[in-house]
Amino acid sequence: DHGNKQIKTVHCSPFVSGLQQSITKPFGQSLQYRGNYYTLSNERIPFRKDKTEDDRFFVLTLIAIAEELEARQIGKQELYNIQLPVGLPPAHFGAQAKKFTDYFKRDGIVEFVYRDKPYAIRITDVVCYPQAYAAAATMLHTLMDDPKAVVLDIGGFTADYLLLKNGKADLTSCDSLENGVILLYNKIRSRGNSELDLLLDESDVDAILAGRKTSYPAEAVRLVERLAQEFVNDLFSTLRERMLDLRYSKVVFVGGGAILLRRQIEASGKVGTPLFVTNINANAAGFEYLYRLETAGR
């Protein structure tokens, strides 16, 4: 799951979609590929709708593959054959799916070194699925009797919505809104600095919204929670302008932003029946689930 904020696989902990590149081996853990060294960075790659413009998301994918092989405890092999289900926002799916799958279809064997361990992989298959739909895939059978339901994936830079009719995706009623939680982080950082002379980073905001104990004063907590509630209310108002009234339908919330903002979503009073997919890796798990269904008869 190639998020603008994080890369996620089925079994690994998410990591930030950020890379530092150098021609000499850096201190610490790194990946070596095509004569360059790469280390993970907390500084995200700037938002881009087209992630195929350079090799950075491919390098992040190599790291994800190595981490997933390790997590699955797959023993050392001379060559790993990799099947790679990936995803795109529903609104970009039709226009970008072929280009995105072609980006990962590298000819022949790809060799790299990660954490001082050599890997040789062959990507034998790449299939692309709509995000949001994939995250909700395992629960779609529970929505087959509902004439209308909405899947809302609140991510880093975007909030993707998709209408379901009797459990089936309606790709004519979907879009990707630039209403991700990074917009909220930036607003909180700016207001915290101007109003309270505080420097709040994303981990501070996450801790406050998760209800964890912090050393920040009560007015900082109130500011964060108020702006988070405004963010959620504004998002729902935007959806209503697009003729999606969430008060009278089931809404499946997925994505790290939805998990983070669950209290605000439930407090908004603007959602009839909210259903939460609490696995932050849900899109990645959904891609694998849909891929296994699709290839079961091969």
Predicted regions span which residues?
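Nucleotide/phosphate-binding catalytic cleft detector across ATP-hydrolyzing
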Residues: H2-A149, K168-I182, S203-R298
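Short, basic interhelical loop/turn and adjoining N-cap
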Residues: L196-L200
